[in-house]
Amino acid sequence: MDKYGLIGYPLGHSFSKGYFNEKFENEGIDAQYINFEIPSIEDLTEILDSNPELKGLNVTIPYKEKVISYLDQVSPEANAIGAVNVVKVEHKGDETILKGYNSDVIGFTQSIEPFIESFHKKTLILGTGGASKAINYGLKSLGLETVFVSRYERPGTIQYDKITPEVIKEYNVIVNCTPVGMYPHVDECPPLPYEAMDTHTLLYDLIYNPDETLFMKKGKERGATVKNGLEMLLLQAFASWDFWQEEK
């Protein structure tokens, strides 16, 4: 039986495990998907050694960047992004070859593109973690300018207290890559001047639990178009499977 899995820490609820095991059952695929909750990326070697049937891994927080040093090959896109969330495991004789890809950028780009209008030129990306790198790459591929927003002063970022109503009017696409507002903290939202939002504003939240975050709700009240991260999650899962099944 082939094995696939997810590495990260902590894992808690995993969409991928439920999705793939249901897929395997429904499609008669002799495989299982396992959560590998590892406190250190160094534990990856042990997982590979003790699971010779392993064909592929998804990678989540906090290892999307750290996993790269363990890989034999990285796709040009994942290399440019600087983050990997899909690993293909190939066995050639006694040798194990690890290939890294990024399906986050595929899922995000495909899911936001239908909502981009001609008046959407500039984007605020909330957060600076591994997911935000893929989001930045995807937005630029769609022709949008991007600026990162952080709680801390970092090169190439602006802080939340610098986001005025004027900034919101200019940067009218806002993508939340932070966990702020995720269940169970549903009464929290990024500190933004929501009153400046209008029908030209597009809010995209990578969070999918709850279905509508407070970030989305407050924007919607001002006429903004809003979207959560569930479709991105599904599309990146489709892309993960495609990467694992490639014959190359």
Where are these regions (language model features)?
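Active-site capping/gating segments
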Residues: 110-111, 225-248
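Conserved beta-strand positions in the Rossmann-like core of class I SAM-dependent methyltransferases
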Residues: 34, 124, 147
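Rossmann-like adenosine-cofactor binding region
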Residues: 156-227, 231
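NAD(P)-binding Rossmann-fold cofactor-contacting core
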Residues: 141-159
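Glycine-rich adenosine-cofactor-binding loop
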Residues: 8, 102-105, 112, 116, ...
